[in-house]
Amino acid sequence: MQPWFFLRRAAVLFVVSLAVLPLVHADSDMDAQIRDIVTSELAPTATASDPGGLAAAVYAGGQVTFFNYGFADAAAKRPVTPDTLFNLASLRKIFEATLVALGTGRGELRLDDPVSKYLPELHGDTISHVTIGELVTHTSGLLLPTDHPPWPNETFTREQFIAMLNAWTPPAGVAPGKQRIYTHAGYVLLQLVLERRYAMPIATLIESRILQPLGMTSTFVPARGKDNRAIMPPEIMQRVVQGYSDQGTPIGAPGSQQSYYDFPGTGQMFSSARDLGILLRALLGGAVIDPALRAALEMTEQESFPVDQKFGQAMAWEHVRLDGVTVIDKPGGLNNASAYVGLVPARRLGIVLLANRGEYPHEIARYRILPAIAKL
Protein backbone atom coordinates (compact mmCIF):
# COMPACT_ATOMS: atom_id res chain seq x y z
CA MET A 1 0.00 0.00 0.00
CA GLN A 2 1.38 3.43 -1.01
CA PRO A 3 2.56 5.89 1.67
CA TRP A 4 0.32 8.57 0.21
CA PHE A 5 -2.71 6.47 1.17
CA PHE A 6 -1.80 6.63 4.85
CA LEU A 7 -1.13 10.35 4.63
CA ARG A 8 -4.47 10.94 2.96
CA ARG A 9 -6.30 8.78 5.50
CA ALA A 10 -4.61 10.59 8.39
CA ALA A 11 -5.55 13.94 6.91
CA VAL A 12 -9.21 12.88 6.60
CA LEU A 13 -9.30 11.64 10.19
CA PHE A 14 -7.71 14.88 11.40
CA VAL A 15 -10.33 16.97 9.59
CA VAL A 16 -13.16 14.81 10.98
CA SER A 17 -11.75 15.11 14.50
CA LEU A 18 -11.63 18.88 14.18
CA ALA A 19 -15.29 18.87 13.14
CA VAL A 20 -16.35 16.65 16.04
CA LEU A 21 -14.40 18.45 18.77
CA PRO A 22 -16.68 21.52 18.87
CA LEU A 23 -19.75 19.27 19.12
CA VAL A 24 -18.26 17.30 22.00
CA HIS A 25 -17.25 20.52 23.73
CA ALA A 26 -20.73 21.97 23.19
CA ASP A 27 -22.38 18.86 24.64
CA SER A 28 -20.13 18.86 27.71
CA ASP A 29 -20.71 22.58 28.18
CA MET A 30 -24.48 22.02 27.97
CA ASP A 31 -24.26 19.21 30.53
CA ALA A 32 -22.34 21.48 32.88
CA GLN A 33 -24.89 24.27 32.51
CA ILE A 34 -27.75 21.86 33.21
CA ARG A 35 -25.99 20.56 36.31
CA ASP A 36 -25.38 24.10 37.52
CA ILE A 37 -29.03 25.06 37.05
CA VAL A 38 -30.40 21.95 38.76
CA THR A 39 -27.91 21.98 41.62
CA SER A 40 -28.32 25.68 42.35
CA GLU A 41 -32.10 25.26 42.61
CA LEU A 42 -32.34 21.91 44.40
CA ALA A 43 -29.45 22.01 46.86
CA PRO A 44 -30.96 24.83 48.98
CA THR A 45 -34.19 22.83 49.33
CA ALA A 46 -32.49 19.69 50.64
CA THR A 47 -29.91 20.81 53.19
CA ALA A 48 -28.80 18.99 56.32
CA SER A 49 -31.43 20.92 58.28
CA ASP A 50 -34.28 19.83 55.99
CA PRO A 51 -36.17 16.61 56.75
CA GLY A 52 -35.51 13.52 54.69
CA GLY A 53 -33.95 13.71 51.28
CA LEU A 54 -34.52 14.24 47.59
CA ALA A 55 -33.90 12.26 44.40
CA ALA A 56 -34.09 13.92 41.00
CA ALA A 57 -33.74 12.74 37.43
CA VAL A 58 -33.31 15.14 34.51
CA TYR A 59 -33.72 14.06 30.89
CA ALA A 60 -32.02 16.41 28.44
CA GLY A 61 -29.93 15.93 25.34
CA GLY A 62 -31.03 12.31 25.10
CA GLN A 63 -29.62 11.27 28.46
CA VAL A 64 -30.74 11.02 32.08
CA THR A 65 -28.74 12.60 34.89
CA PHE A 66 -29.41 11.91 38.57
CA PHE A 67 -29.15 14.20 41.59
CA ASN A 68 -29.37 12.91 45.17
CA TYR A 69 -29.59 14.74 48.49
CA GLY A 70 -30.11 13.81 52.12
CA PHE A 71 -31.37 10.65 53.73
CA ALA A 72 -33.93 8.01 52.84
CA ASP A 73 -33.95 7.26 56.57
CA ALA A 74 -32.30 9.86 58.80
CA ALA A 75 -32.19 7.68 61.92
CA ALA A 76 -30.40 4.89 60.04
CA LYS A 77 -28.24 7.38 58.09
CA ARG A 78 -29.33 5.65 54.87
CA PRO A 79 -28.62 8.04 52.00
CA VAL A 80 -30.87 8.70 49.04
CA THR A 81 -29.69 7.09 45.78
CA PRO A 82 -31.22 6.83 42.28
CA ASP A 83 -32.57 3.42 43.35
CA THR A 84 -34.27 4.57 46.56
CA LEU A 85 -38.01 3.89 46.46
CA PHE A 86 -40.44 6.74 47.17
CA ASN A 87 -44.22 6.87 47.44
CA LEU A 88 -45.43 8.50 44.20
CA ALA A 89 -48.70 9.77 45.67
CA SER A 90 -50.84 11.21 42.86
CA LEU A 91 -48.24 10.57 40.16
CA ARG A 92 -50.05 7.25 39.99
CA LYS A 93 -52.84 9.06 38.14
CA ILE A 94 -50.53 9.29 35.10
CA PHE A 95 -50.50 5.50 34.88
CA GLU A 96 -54.27 5.16 35.21
CA ALA A 97 -54.72 7.82 32.53
CA THR A 98 -52.37 5.83 30.29
CA LEU A 99 -54.53 2.73 30.81
CA VAL A 100 -57.54 4.74 29.63
CA ALA A 101 -55.62 5.98 26.58
CA LEU A 102 -54.46 2.45 25.75
CA GLY A 103 -58.01 1.14 26.05
CA THR A 104 -59.28 3.93 23.83
CA GLY A 105 -56.66 3.24 21.18
CA ARG A 106 -57.46 -0.47 21.17
CA GLY A 107 -61.20 0.08 20.96
CA GLU A 108 -61.76 -1.47 24.39
CA LEU A 109 -63.51 1.57 25.83
CA ARG A 110 -64.50 5.09 24.85
CA LEU A 111 -63.96 8.41 26.56
CA ASP A 112 -67.66 9.19 26.20
CA ASP A 113 -68.71 5.91 27.84
CA PRO A 114 -70.76 6.66 30.98
CA VAL A 115 -69.30 5.04 34.08
CA SER A 116 -72.65 3.31 34.63
CA LYS A 117 -71.92 1.20 31.54
CA TYR A 118 -69.29 -0.64 33.57
CA LEU A 119 -70.68 -0.04 37.05
CA PRO A 120 -74.47 -0.38 36.73
CA GLU A 121 -74.75 -0.01 40.50
CA LEU A 122 -74.16 3.69 39.83
CA HIS A 123 -77.72 4.83 39.18
CA GLY A 124 -77.81 8.30 40.73
CA ASP A 125 -79.23 11.09 38.57
CA THR A 126 -75.84 12.78 38.14
CA ILE A 127 -73.18 10.11 38.58
CA SER A 128 -74.77 7.72 36.08
CA HIS A 129 -74.09 10.22 33.30
CA VAL A 130 -70.47 11.04 34.21
CA THR A 131 -68.11 9.73 31.52
CA ILE A 132 -64.70 8.10 31.61
CA GLY A 133 -63.29 11.12 29.79
CA GLU A 134 -64.62 13.45 32.47
CA LEU A 135 -63.09 11.36 35.23
CA VAL A 136 -59.65 11.20 33.63
CA THR A 137 -59.57 14.97 32.96
CA HIS A 138 -60.92 16.09 36.36
CA THR A 139 -64.02 17.60 34.74
CA SER A 140 -66.67 15.33 36.29
CA GLY A 141 -67.59 17.84 39.01
CA LEU A 142 -66.59 15.42 41.75
CA LEU A 143 -64.60 17.12 44.47
CA LEU A 144 -61.72 16.31 46.76
CA PRO A 145 -62.58 13.55 49.25
CA THR A 146 -62.95 15.83 52.26
CA ASP A 147 -65.71 17.64 50.37
CA HIS A 148 -67.69 14.42 49.96
CA PRO A 149 -68.92 13.54 53.43
CA PRO A 150 -69.25 11.04 54.91
CA TRP A 151 -65.56 10.50 54.08
CA PRO A 152 -63.33 8.75 55.05
CA ASN A 153 -61.53 6.47 57.42
CA GLU A 154 -60.07 3.01 57.21
CA THR A 155 -63.51 1.43 57.64
CA PHE A 156 -64.98 3.35 54.70
CA THR A 157 -66.17 0.64 52.32
CA ARG A 158 -66.76 0.35 48.62
CA GLU A 159 -70.49 0.14 49.30
CA GLN A 160 -70.39 3.43 51.20
CA PHE A 161 -68.44 5.01 48.36
CA ILE A 162 -71.02 3.89 45.78
CA ALA A 163 -73.85 5.11 48.01
CA MET A 164 -72.15 8.49 48.37
CA LEU A 165 -71.77 8.77 44.59
CA ASN A 166 -75.41 7.85 43.97
CA ALA A 167 -76.53 10.52 46.43
CA TRP A 168 -74.18 13.14 45.01
CA THR A 169 -75.71 16.35 43.69
CA PRO A 170 -73.25 18.94 42.36
CA PRO A 171 -73.48 22.44 43.81
CA ALA A 172 -75.08 25.21 41.78
CA GLY A 173 -73.06 26.05 38.70
CA VAL A 174 -71.21 22.72 38.62
CA ALA A 175 -72.03 20.01 36.09
CA PRO A 176 -70.14 17.09 34.51
CA GLY A 177 -67.89 18.28 31.70
CA LYS A 178 -68.31 22.00 32.44
CA GLN A 179 -65.39 22.77 34.78
CA ARG A 180 -62.05 21.48 36.01
CA ILE A 181 -62.01 20.48 39.68
CA TYR A 182 -59.10 18.33 40.84
CA THR A 183 -60.54 15.19 42.38
CA HIS A 184 -59.20 12.10 44.11
CA ALA A 185 -62.68 10.62 44.26
CA GLY A 186 -62.89 10.69 40.46
CA TYR A 187 -59.72 8.63 40.13
CA VAL A 188 -60.83 6.15 42.78
CA LEU A 189 -63.95 5.69 40.66
CA LEU A 190 -61.86 5.47 37.49
CA GLN A 191 -59.87 2.64 39.06
CA LEU A 192 -63.09 0.74 39.79
CA VAL A 193 -64.23 1.24 36.19
CA LEU A 194 -60.93 -0.10 34.81
CA GLU A 195 -60.97 -3.09 37.13
CA ARG A 196 -64.54 -3.95 36.11
CA ARG A 197 -63.83 -3.47 32.38
CA TYR A 198 -60.78 -5.72 32.36
CA ALA A 199 -61.77 -8.08 35.20
CA MET A 200 -58.40 -7.75 36.93
CA PRO A 201 -56.84 -5.67 39.71
CA ILE A 202 -55.48 -2.24 38.87
CA ALA A 203 -51.98 -3.34 39.94
CA THR A 204 -52.02 -6.14 37.36
CA LEU A 205 -53.22 -3.76 34.65
CA ILE A 206 -50.49 -1.21 35.37
CA GLU A 207 -47.81 -3.90 35.59
CA SER A 208 -48.76 -5.82 32.43
CA ARG A 209 -49.71 -2.92 30.17
CA ILE A 210 -47.23 -0.22 31.16
CA LEU A 211 -44.43 -1.21 33.53
CA GLN A 212 -43.34 -4.45 31.86
CA PRO A 213 -43.44 -3.06 28.29
CA LEU A 214 -41.34 -0.07 29.37
CA GLY A 215 -38.90 -2.16 31.40
CA MET A 216 -39.71 -0.39 34.67
CA THR A 217 -38.64 -3.12 37.07
CA SER A 218 -38.46 -0.98 40.22
CA THR A 219 -41.98 0.43 40.18
CA PHE A 220 -44.59 -1.27 42.34
CA VAL A 221 -48.30 -1.06 43.10
CA PRO A 222 -48.32 -3.14 46.27
CA ALA A 223 -51.24 -4.48 48.22
CA ARG A 224 -51.82 -2.91 51.63
CA GLY A 225 -51.32 -5.11 54.67
CA LYS A 226 -53.29 -5.11 57.90
CA ASP A 227 -50.72 -2.78 59.43
CA ASN A 228 -51.31 -0.32 56.57
CA ARG A 229 -47.86 -1.04 55.15
CA ALA A 230 -47.17 -2.03 51.59
CA ILE A 231 -46.72 -5.76 51.09
CA MET A 232 -43.34 -6.07 49.37
CA PRO A 233 -40.39 -8.48 49.69
CA PRO A 234 -37.84 -7.55 52.38
CA GLU A 235 -35.12 -6.78 49.83
CA ILE A 236 -37.47 -4.28 48.17
CA MET A 237 -38.70 -2.79 51.44
CA GLN A 238 -35.09 -2.06 52.41
CA ARG A 239 -34.99 0.47 49.57
CA VAL A 240 -38.16 2.31 50.67
CA VAL A 241 -37.89 5.70 52.37
CA GLN A 242 -39.01 6.73 55.81
CA GLY A 243 -41.55 9.49 55.34
CA TYR A 244 -41.46 12.79 57.26
CA SER A 245 -43.70 15.76 57.78
CA ASP A 246 -42.51 19.08 56.44
CA GLN A 247 -41.40 19.79 60.03
CA GLY A 248 -39.26 16.64 60.19
CA THR A 249 -41.51 14.36 62.24
CA PRO A 250 -41.44 10.72 61.06
CA ILE A 251 -44.88 9.68 59.81
CA GLY A 252 -45.60 5.98 59.59
CA ALA A 253 -43.08 3.21 58.99
CA PRO A 254 -41.29 2.83 55.65
CA GLY A 255 -43.82 1.60 53.13
CA SER A 256 -46.79 2.87 55.10
CA GLN A 257 -49.89 3.17 52.95
CA GLN A 258 -52.15 6.15 53.35
CA SER A 259 -55.53 5.36 51.88
CA TYR A 260 -58.93 6.97 51.83
CA TYR A 261 -60.33 3.48 52.06
CA ASP A 262 -59.45 0.02 50.82
CA PHE A 263 -59.44 1.00 47.13
CA PRO A 264 -56.40 3.29 46.91
CA GLY A 265 -56.96 4.92 43.54
CA THR A 266 -55.46 8.14 44.85
CA GLY A 267 -51.88 6.98 45.17
CA GLN A 268 -49.93 4.16 46.79
CA MET A 269 -47.32 3.39 44.19
CA PHE A 270 -43.59 3.19 44.76
CA SER A 271 -40.78 3.94 42.33
CA SER A 272 -37.25 5.28 42.03
CA ALA A 273 -35.68 8.18 40.19
CA ARG A 274 -33.90 5.66 37.97
CA ASP A 275 -37.12 3.91 36.97
CA LEU A 276 -38.92 7.18 36.38
CA GLY A 277 -35.99 8.19 34.19
CA ILE A 278 -37.09 5.32 31.94
CA LEU A 279 -40.57 6.83 31.89
CA LEU A 280 -39.13 10.23 30.95
CA ARG A 281 -37.35 8.67 27.96
CA ALA A 282 -40.57 7.04 26.82
CA LEU A 283 -42.63 10.19 27.28
CA LEU A 284 -40.14 12.34 25.38
CA GLY A 285 -39.43 10.04 22.44
CA GLY A 286 -36.03 8.87 23.63
CA ALA A 287 -36.85 5.16 23.76
CA VAL A 288 -38.02 2.55 21.28
CA ILE A 289 -41.36 1.33 22.62
CA ASP A 290 -44.53 -0.31 21.35
CA PRO A 291 -46.28 2.10 18.96
CA ALA A 292 -49.63 1.64 20.72
CA LEU A 293 -48.09 2.52 24.08
CA ARG A 294 -46.30 5.52 22.57
CA ALA A 295 -49.59 6.75 21.09
CA ALA A 296 -51.28 6.31 24.47
CA LEU A 297 -48.59 8.29 26.29
CA GLU A 298 -48.86 11.07 23.72
CA MET A 299 -52.65 11.05 24.03
CA THR A 300 -52.50 11.60 27.77
CA GLU A 301 -50.41 14.75 27.26
CA GLN A 302 -52.86 16.47 24.90
CA GLU A 303 -54.73 19.36 26.48
CA SER A 304 -58.46 18.65 26.45
CA PHE A 305 -59.91 21.28 28.77
CA PRO A 306 -58.50 24.84 28.68
CA VAL A 307 -59.03 26.48 32.06
CA ASP A 308 -57.63 29.93 31.31
CA GLN A 309 -54.89 31.57 29.27
CA LYS A 310 -52.17 30.11 31.47
CA PHE A 311 -53.53 26.70 32.48
CA GLY A 312 -55.12 23.68 30.84
CA GLN A 313 -56.01 20.11 31.78
CA ALA A 314 -55.03 16.95 29.93
CA MET A 315 -55.51 13.31 30.97
CA ALA A 316 -53.99 13.58 34.47
CA TRP A 317 -51.33 15.98 33.14
CA GLU A 318 -51.58 19.75 33.56
CA HIS A 319 -50.50 22.36 31.00
CA VAL A 320 -48.83 25.51 32.31
CA ARG A 321 -48.10 28.20 29.73
CA LEU A 322 -45.16 30.35 30.76
CA ASP A 323 -43.23 33.00 28.85
CA GLY A 324 -41.68 31.19 25.90
CA VAL A 325 -42.30 27.67 27.17
CA THR A 326 -45.20 25.32 27.95
CA VAL A 327 -44.65 22.90 30.81
CA ILE A 328 -46.73 19.71 30.98
CA ASP A 329 -46.56 18.30 34.47
CA LYS A 330 -48.12 16.39 37.34
CA PRO A 331 -47.41 17.03 41.02
CA GLY A 332 -48.35 14.69 43.82
CA GLY A 333 -48.14 14.74 47.58
CA LEU A 334 -49.07 13.16 50.89
CA ASN A 335 -48.29 14.42 54.36
CA ASN A 336 -45.02 12.44 54.26
CA ALA A 337 -44.17 12.38 50.54
CA SER A 338 -43.88 14.72 47.57
CA ALA A 339 -43.46 13.85 43.90
CA TYR A 340 -43.34 15.70 40.60
CA VAL A 341 -42.88 14.95 36.90
CA GLY A 342 -42.50 17.83 34.46
CA LEU A 343 -42.04 17.82 30.69
CA VAL A 344 -41.17 20.32 27.98
CA PRO A 345 -41.91 18.14 24.93
CA ALA A 346 -40.89 20.87 22.49
CA ARG A 347 -37.34 20.61 23.85
CA ARG A 348 -37.43 16.89 24.74
CA LEU A 349 -36.75 17.92 28.30
CA GLY A 350 -38.08 16.43 31.52
CA ILE A 351 -37.53 16.23 35.25
CA VAL A 352 -38.58 14.00 38.15
CA LEU A 353 -38.48 15.10 41.79
CA LEU A 354 -39.07 12.62 44.64
CA ALA A 355 -38.94 13.73 48.28
CA ASN A 356 -39.74 11.80 51.44
CA ARG A 357 -41.35 14.75 53.16
CA GLY A 358 -44.62 16.58 52.85
CA GLU A 359 -44.94 19.97 51.19
CA TYR A 360 -41.72 19.85 49.18
CA PRO A 361 -41.62 23.00 46.98
CA HIS A 362 -41.87 21.22 43.62
CA GLU A 363 -42.93 24.48 41.96
CA ILE A 364 -39.24 25.31 41.50
CA ALA A 365 -39.12 22.68 38.75
CA ARG A 366 -42.15 24.12 36.95
CA TYR A 367 -41.28 27.79 37.19
CA ARG A 368 -37.48 27.84 37.43
CA ILE A 369 -35.58 24.68 36.46
CA LEU A 370 -37.45 23.62 33.32
CA PRO A 371 -37.73 27.15 31.85
CA ALA A 372 -34.04 27.81 32.54
CA ILE A 373 -32.88 24.60 30.86
CA ALA A 374 -35.28 25.14 27.96
CA LYS A 375 -33.53 28.43 27.18
CA LEU A 376 -30.08 26.82 26.79
Regions found by a protein language model. Name each.
Residues V24-A26, A32:
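Boundary at the C-terminal end of the N-terminal hydrophobic targeting segment
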Residues A10-V20:
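Bacterial N-terminal signal peptides
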Residues F66, D73, D125-N335:
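Short, surface-exposed loop or secondary-structure junction motifs
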Residues D31-F86, E108, T169:
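Short, conserved catalytic-motif segment at the N-terminal edge
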Residues Q2-V12:
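Bacterial N-terminal signal peptides that target proteins for export
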Residues Q309-K310, D323-V325, G358-L376:
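Short, gly/Ser/Thr-rich active-site loops of penicillin-recognizing serine hydrolases
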Residues A48-L54, A76-E134, A172-A185, P264-G267, ...:
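Short active-site loop at a secondary-structure junction
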Residues D329-K330, S338-R357:
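Short, well-ordered beta-strand elements
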